[in-house]
From Swiss-Prot:
Stored InterPro entries: CD46, Compl-Cell_Adhes-Reg, Sushi/SCR/CCP_sf, Sushi_SCR_CCP_dom
PTM annotation: May be O-glycosylated. N-glycosylated.
Complex and partners: Interacts with C3b. Interacts with C4b. Interacts with moesin/MSN.
Gene coding for it: Cd46
Protein name from the UniProt record: Membrane cofactor protein
Segments on the Cytoplasmic side according to the record's topology features: 351-365
Domain of life: Eukaryota
Residue pairs linked by disulfide bridges in the UniProt entry: C109-C151, C137-C168, C173-C221, C202-C234, C239-C281, C267-C294
Signal peptide: 1-44
Extracellular-facing ranges: 45-329
Membrane spanning stretches: 330-350
Species the sequence originates in: Mus musculus (Mouse)
Length: 365
């Protein structure tokens, strides 16, 4: 009995490009190469993460061998602080020792002093470059100058404030504005202190219609040359006689209705009111809100409005639930696809190994 001849190299399953076996074997070879590469790279260190205060000297690499060293330098705007090391070594556990940018400190501006009758606050908690300093004054004083200074970088290792520190001065106000047909108290004072107040009043009128004071009657010095409110006006305000058809006045009746006169209404029996039952005479000679209406019949009940999602532009709750369910299905599909992909890759490698084993056994026979 003669031994079976060995399969020619050109007809080997892994050599026939048109066969499915060649496809499986090729994928297996790629998987082995990937495992080989990962096993060799597992003993290397990756490039360390970027640091805020220091940067790598020279050209960086993707991987470094165990025992290999890298050297750092402080970035622009940072100063080296001895005795911190600027060299790190790749350790067998894939870490760099030591690795810290504590040896590089940020360049600082000079520390600012509190002004008289004021304080300085460092908004960012420091006075290094990029920081801000805010100046405030005690009550009754105001800041003269820039209230906020910025620490800016000059060159590589210097920093300075972008302006001169301000100072605090007492708050004073010039006399308040004069008004037509009226006056204010303390007209003989030329300079008013902080929180000093004046009151306005209207002049008497020669006719039957009196002037009304429209606005705030008292204002005070609230800031440097700043009064707490605008001055009021003195003018004649008359609103028309309030008439409510199918209704009547129950409060505030009179012959003249001047500024801020208030009246109240009610409807006759068999009518209901649409609008506000109380109105006030405003500065523009009209009633606010508008005089109501008395409509015949019983007061209607408020109809129940449809849910907000029934209006155009609002999604319904069903659409929201469907969207959430759809997102969950997409996530589940991605997870299942990933698991199946890993399983297929493992199966490819296993089948390729089994095929090689069978081929070797056949060749040995």
């Amino acid at each position: 009995m003669t031994a079976a001849p060995l399969m020619p190299d050109s007809t080997h399953p892994c050599r026939r490009r048109k066969s499915y076996t060649f496809f499986w074997c090729s994928l297996g070879v790629y998987a082995e190469a990937l495992l080989f590469l990962l096993s060799h790279l597992s003993d290397a260190c990756e490039l360390p993460r970027p640091f805020e205060a220091m940067e790598l000297k020279g050209t960086p690499k993707l991987f470094y061998a165990v025992g290999e060293k890298i050297e750092y330098k402080c970035k622009k705007g940072y100063l080296y602080l001895s005795p911190y090391l600027m060299i790190a070594t790749c350790e067998p556990n894939h870490t760099w020792v030591p690795i810290s940018d504590a040896g590089c400190i940020k360049v600082q501006c000079t520390m600012l002093q509190d002004p008289s009758f004021g304080k300085v606050y460092y908004i960012d908690g420091s006075f290094s470059w990029g920081a801000r300093a805010k100046f405030t004054c005690m009550e009754g004083y105001y800041v003269v100058g820039m209230s906020v200074l910025h620490c800016v970088l000059k060159g590589d290792d210097e920093a300075y404030w972008n302006g001169y520190p301000p100072h605090c001065e007492k708050i004073y106000c010039l006399p308040p504005p004069k008004i037509k047909n009226g006056t204010h108290t303390l007209t003989d004072i030329n300079v008013f202190k902080y929180h000093e107040a004046v009151s306005y009043s209207c002049d008497p009128t020669p006719g039957p219609d009196k002037f009304s004071l429209v606005g705030t009657s008292m204002i005070f010095c609230a800031g440097h040359n700043t009064w707490s409110n605008s001055p009021p006006e003195c003018k004649v305000v008359k609103c028309p006689n309030p008439v409510l058809q199918n209704g009547r006045l129950i409060s505030g009746a009179g012959e003249i209705f001047s500024y801020q006169s208030t009246v109240m209404f009610e409807c006759l029996q068999g009518f209901y009111m649409e609008g506000s039952s109380m109105v006030i005479c405003s500065a523009n000679n009209s009633w606010e809100p508008s005089i109501p209406k008395c409509l015949k019949g019983p007061r209607p009940t408020h109809p129940t409005k449809p849910p907000v999602y029934n209006y155009t532009g609002y999604p319904s709750p069903r659409e929201g639930i469907f969207s959430q369910e759809l997102d969950a299905w997409i996530i589940a599909l991605i997870v299942i696809t990933s698991i199946v992909g890993v399983f297929i890759l493992c199966l490819i490698v296993l089948r390729c190994f089994e095929h090689r084993k069978k081929t070797n056994v056949s060749a040995a026979r």
